[in-house]
Amino acid sequence: MSKADDLRSQLIRSFATPDASWSTFKREPHYESEGVRLARGTAAKKLGMSVDIVPPGKRACPYHFHYAEEEAFIVLEGSGTLRVAGEMLPITAGDVIFIPPGPEYPHQILNTSDAPLKYLSLSVNAELEICEYPDSDKVGVAV
């Protein structure tokens, strides 16, 4: 393997190729999305990145907040609603969403349209992460 090939395998990922590893996250009737995790297996140590597609009428994940991780979302296609801090904010293609850590910013992305909602997720992966789910009074810990 050449140095260029090695660098490419450690630094570049594509979600637009047939061999991209898409997976489905589904918990009926609440959550459903299809996504490809891009940072896994790369040289990145503290970044998480994925492309997610949420079908019409579905939510990507539970309403939650992180104690350590920051997140950003770039809406690539479609429109929907960002549920954040008890408010419902419209989102559409071209919007960039910044979510700081902490209980002030519980968040959830909902597809409230009749077309798929596609977005890029970016996160700073913490060594120890606590995630809280206000709707269900659950807490998750990742190490």
What are these regions (language model features)?
Residues 1-46, 130-143:
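A short, N-terminal "cap"/entry segment at the start of jelly-roll beta-barrel domains
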Residues 85-102:
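Short acidic-glycine-tyrosine-enriched beta hairpin
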Residues 110-143:
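Double-stranded beta-helix
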Residues 62, 82-83, 99, 106-113:
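Short beta-strand His + acidic residue motifs that chelate non-heme Fe in jelly-roll/DSBH
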Residues 51-55, 66-84, 122-126:
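Short, conserved beta-strand element in jelly-roll/cupin
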Residues 32-37, 50-66, 104:
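Conserved short histidine dyad/triad with adjacent acidic residue
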Residues 43, 68, 103, 114-115:
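Short strand-connecting beta-turns/loops that link adjacent beta-strands
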